[in-house]
Amino acid sequence: MIYNVSYVIFKENLMEFSKTIKELRKRTGLTQQKLAEELGVSLLTVARWEKGQFKPNPTISRMVWEYIEKLGKGYEDLLSGLSNNEQMNIKDMETMLWQAACSIRGEKDAPKFKDYILPLLFIKRLSDVFEDEIARLVKEYGDEKSARKVLEADHSLVRFYIPEEATWPVLSGRKEFKYTDNKTPKTLGEKITNALRLIAKENPSLNGVIDTVDFNATHNGEREISDDALNRLIEKFSNPDYRLGINDVEPDFLGRAYEYLLRKFAESSGQSAGEFFTPQEVGWLIAKIMSPKQGEEIYDPCSGSGGLLVKCQLELLARDGKEKVKKPLKLYGQELTGSSFAIARMNMVVHDMEGEILRGNTMTNPKFQDQSGGLKQFDIVVTNPMWNQDNIDPDFYENDPHERFSSRGGYAPASSADWAWVQHVHASLKPKGRAAIVLDTGAASRGSGSQSENKEKTIRKWFVDNDLIEGVILLPDNLFYNTTAAGIILLINKNKSPERKGKIILINASDEFEKGRPKNYLTESALKKISAAFNSGVEIKKFLKIVSCKEIAEKHDYNISPSRFIETGEAVEHRDIQLILDDIAKIEKEQSKNEQDLKKIFLRLGYKWN
């Protein structure tokens, strides 16, 4: 899917750039030839720009940007049409990241790549942005010396202050730095580690975010990653076409980079790597369905790299327009795995989003609590917990200090904590809160139709009887990297609209996919179709059905699986049995006649037919 999306974005950017060049010529009165001379390019190049046939490289694109800036008032609006084209496109990003990953692939397993690539990518981004901010201060104070003097006195003038020895030119060896008191690093790994720790020291919000990896670490006397491998990584990121400054990449560049690498790690490492990755299309679908409002608090108890939270914020910005968003979302997440926790923190910093990511086991030790020690409650919860988690002691549910389980249908079985996560999510919602939870398909039906007692069905019954389930969406097979199973999105709403009370919206989206390698993916049109259908709540044949909670209880034994109610295939027409028997008799009669004719033929030939 990423390749398809990048192509669309690339084409859209070409058209926007084309309009900008045409408008520039119109306002200046320049001919194509004259503009080409002004910019130092050929007449053919300008002509191709205007036809949307050619996108300039980053160097030329920056030159166009600077030319428009020099024109002054009356031309500033053209910069908005140019900015997207100056930025690295998704395909360029993917190429850069995978080349970097491959450059050290022989030294580290795929799941370990991120421990080294992402912090380096982050420091490159910080350094390039810092350079841009220095340039801004130079314009304001007249020269670089004055600008740096002012900055040394007030670090708050920039987003993040980067000490000289931690800047990318010094790390990459392109600029010399004179270390004092014999503090010259002995290895490149030590140099990088020191730089990351120094940046974190100067910028407290980055503590525990970028300074958690030791690039100089050893195991059994050998370096975990050699200086040669680190140098190869640095050289890949030092390509001038891969600059990561303020206007070089889109705001969510690092978020996209994290997702891309996580996806590639999952592809390379097999199912074991899939646990930290939710397919980005599923995340976008959830964001579109939740449609968060300005100022709302959103929580992910299993936040991973923070992708679901970030997508909610980006969906808000895309829907309302960045300039109209006066109250950003407040994002909260908890994550157990150290590396994913650090990436989630990076994601928040990079996106300049208001939020808090804490580390710990949410099920046994939920960190977000109110002043009285109870669970903090949120407007929206989005999450993709581990499916069928079977390592929770059953006694834990009974002794839970937050009483998340006994009052919400009972205790989940030892074999699967799916509904325990749903119970935690419900306990974390405000009185009018909503939630989207990605679960194993079996969570919708296990225990239904059986005469014996089933703990999951009992909990499911509680949620249905209390009219808390607003919808269930069945996803296509083979989307997730840790399983080929389809998965569902369970939608909880504590405050359903009057027309939806007592009903559940079921969507069978199992056919809404494109084949991919190695996994299937949801198309952009599928995302729009599914989200629009759910939000409208109008029945669609073979796709969306509205079922009453009463019918689900009385006729379906609390089975809420969309596939039980919606068949996507063509209906098979069955013929009347008597007609079938009549046809069989006719065939047998014809067969008997044919046999008699054959007997006569063989007798004339001297053969006896027995």
Q: What does each model-found stretch correspond to?
A:
Residues 2-27, 184, 202:
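A short, Lys/Arg-rich alpha-helix, primarily the initiator
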Residues 25, 36, 65:
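The alpha-helix within a helix-turn-helix
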Residues 57-77:
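DNA major-groove recognition helix of helix-turn-helix/homeodomain DNA-binding modules
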Residues 272-383, 388-390, 394-399, 405, ...:
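Conserved S-adenosyl-L-methionine
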Residues 372-610:
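A conserved structural/catalytic subdomain of Rossmann-like adenosyl-cofactor enzymes
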